[in-house]
Every structure is written in C-alpha cells, then in structure tokens.
Amino acid sequence: MSGHDSGNARRGRASFGAFVRKPVERGAAASTGAAAEQGSLEAAQDWPDDAVEVGAVVDAYGLKGWIKVAAHADAGRGGDALLSARRWWLERGAERLSVRILQSKTHGDTVVAQPAGVDDRDAALAMRGFRVFVRREDFPALAADEFYWVDLIGLEVVNEQSVSLGKVSGMIDNGVHSILRVEYPTVGKDGAPATDERLIPFVGVYVKTVDQAARRIVVDWEADY
C-alpha cells in the first residue's frame, strides 16, 4: 500500500510490511465529509503517473454499496494508503475508473470502503475484480528512517567495498523480515547475456544505509555470496 520498511532494519529488525497480501486488523476509519457525497464513479481520462497498485476489490460489504478490498500489505502499512487516500484509481482489463472514497476502515483481514456513486450491494458486487491504485503522493508520511517498498525498487545496491551487486527488482516478506531481491547481469551457460538474482535480508546486520536521493543502498554483503 505497499507497505513500508524502517530504519529499524539498521538495528537488526524490519518493522514494516510491503505490498504483499498479509493484511491485519487496524480499527481506524476515515471520512471525507458531506462534500465528498457529491462525487461519483468517473472514467479515468488521465491516469496518474505515480499510481501504485495497493489492493484489489474482492467482494461487496453489507447492503449499502460498500466494497471489500484485499490490501497488498498489512492494513497498518500498505493498507494505510487505502485508508488515507480520498480518491482511488481502479483498473479492470481496459476499463479504468476514478472514484472518490466517502469512508474507509479495516475489517478483519481487509479494508472496506464506501465509494461515491455506489449505492447498493449489486453495484458493489459489480466492482469485483478491479485492481485498486493510489497516488504515491497520497501515501501517509513516514518517519525519516522509514521507507515504502515501492521507493526501494530500482535502487542500486553496493557493498562496503563499493562493488555493485545489482539493482532492487522486488521485495519479499518472509514473515520475519523483509528481503531485497537484487537483480544483476551475468552470462548464461551458452555465453549469452543473462540476469541472475541474489536475496539480501533487509536487516541491520546487512543493510548499512539507504540513500533515496542517491538511489543507493549500501550493504555488508560480498559479491560471491
């Protein structure tokens, strides 16, 4: 909503989730107020450049037009993006919509929300299968030593000897801590150019610094590990 990782990694643990399907309950709710009630589902003519996929509509919730969303992160992390954003961007096949969110809250392992213009259960059921996107600028602010996974993708990874280990191609949550997926160029058995991947735990014993401005992560990791 992804989710985010923290500078706590530098202290030996990662306290953030990521855009993976591991939601947990969080009881906060949000509302845009009466003015938002004038909104409705709209065709998305201009898709935001910073749109990040944070979930998917999986079902209706109740009888009054609420929808149920499986967040691609725990509800206290990437789910925060769903709860904080007052406008969601929806995509299903070639169909793209923009919707104002009147209310949202966690419900068990999901986030439930009331979109403007969706007034009954049938209309909510018709929204199943939409992927949900939120603008990156609408994500909740993090502490200085915390990072959203989406912001780590593409950063160069180097070790303390300044040897390049590749670039972050993705993240994994193994249930205990986060793991960097680092892709690097290599040569295949046939001599043709290829790519390979190394997995580096995002914990303090290995991750020394994360410099988003320089787009670089420094790790205690050898190239031949």
From Swiss-Prot:
Residues 144-225 form the PRC barrel domain. The keyword Chaperone applies. One of its GO terms (biological process) is rRNA processing. It comes from the Bacteria. Pfam families: PRC_RimM, RimM. Keywords: Chaperone, Cytoplasm, Ribosome biogenesis, rRNA processing. One of its GO terms (molecular function) is ribosome binding. The keyword Cytoplasm applies. GO terms for cellular component: cytoplasm; ribosome. Disulfide bonds: none annotated. It is found in: Cytoplasm. InterPro entries: PRC_barrel-like_sf, PRC_RimM, RimM, RimM_N, RimM_N_sf, Transl_B-barrel_sf. Binds ribosomal protein uS19. An accessory protein needed during the final step in the assembly of 30S ribosomal subunit, possibly for assembly of the head region. Essential for efficient processing of 16S rRNA. May be needed both before and after RbfA during the maturation of 16S rRNA. It has affinity for free ribosomal 30S subunits but not for 70S ribosomes. The PRC barrel domain binds ribosomal protein uS19. Belongs to the RimM family. This is Ribosome maturation factor RimM. It comes from Burkholderia vietnamiensis (strain G4 / LMG 22486) (Burkholderia cepacia (strain R1808)). The gene is rimM.
